[in-house]
Amino acid sequence: YLPLATIAWGLALNYTMANMDFLGKYDGLMGVPPITVFGLALNDGKGMYVLIWAFALAAALAALHLLDSRPGRAIRALKSGTTMAEAMGISTFRYKLVVFVLAAILAAISGWLYAHFQRTVNPSPFGINKGIEYLFMAVLGGVGHVWGAFLGAGVVKLVEDQLQVLLPRLIGTSGNFEVIVFGIVMIVVLKYAPEGLWSFVARRFPQPARRKDWADAPPLPARSKPQRGDLLLQVQAVRKEFGGLVAVNDISFDIRAGDIVGLIGPNGAGKSTTFNLVTGVQGLTRGQVLFRGQPVGGLSSRQIAQAGMSRTFQHVKMIPEMTVLENVALGGYLRSRSGTLQAMLRLDRAEERGLFAEAEAQLQRIGMAHQMHELAGNLALGPQRLMEIARALCTDPALLLLDEPAAGLRHQEKLALAGVLRQVK
């Protein structure tokens, strides 16, 4: 709905402003003064060219810094859906809003530069056609790749200029036929290269492994832990109905600190649904869930994660484009505080070192430290499940819920998992 609402809002503003007398209607505003920098008026194209590139590179650098940070990993987690991100304590609504505002700021700066460069401004460059063209640039270059935006914009404009010359000669008539060509190209790209053109560049020139600079990083804040034997979780007559189907039928059990408890049942018995009810992914039909003596039945996944409960999932949820180390560091989100502006200005490095030190420690704990620089999407299912456990441990939970953790693991990996669970106990 958001893309459609954004397009509709843009169309409404476009037509509204095009009918306002004081804005010049469709003719727009003429005689926009040049930008003045330190008393120097940028009247020529050369000065504006330098200024535009300065803004573009500064924006790219800020975006790269942001993506390589605590809030950046939270933003990248949105691509995999909200369930995993919320379970790590991330406010998905907040970061969607952050992305929207940052995109609006960049668009506003671009419009300001455009108006002063052209010395005139009218509604046509801000209409639906241009919006679709900008979207195509992002898709072609690679959504989520900062340099992909530059590549996509360059390719689209170069090809567009050539098509505007060649197509009228081939067809024998003039028109915006390049739109049809771009539509076909977009379908081909989405089918055969959904990650965009930059993904080919990234595969050919992979990034070097992250420099290990966190050996002397201070530890992250630790959560207060219950004493062995303390009552941690109480599930009391919990029931979940989907229409007329009863998925969980009045289940009750208690878990105490230091216990390893297994929830056993055949496929479709409601085990994962029970996990979802306990962790706030789904709401209860009736019953009560108490965590450390406090009712959590009506809380969100994020609030329950803040209370000290962490989990893995039946089907592995991760960010394939990030390294194993970065995926695990996502689990330390609630144990750090750096924000968007700090990340852009690179003022969060001390905290980042602490996050990566904790992530490496948890990977060593499960025997995956040697794979920490590999892309998570390149791992087999077994290591991906172990990585999920390391991510959950990185939250420093009081209660750890593992949904089918041994599924897909080989014998030696299962033995290693059993050792980790005994150590956590």
Predicted segment positions?
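The feature captures the beta-strand-to-loop junction immediately N-terminal to the Walker
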Residues: 261-266
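Helix-to-loop junction immediately C-terminal to a conserved catalytic motif
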Residues: 279
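Catalytic Walker B motif of ABC-type/P-loop ATPase nucleotide-binding domains
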Residues: 400-404
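Conserved ABC transporter NBD signature motif
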Residues: 287-294, 306-307
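Conserved ABC nucleotide-binding domain
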Residues: 297-298, 356, 362-383
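Transmembrane alpha-helices and adjacent helix-loop boundaries
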Residues: 1-218
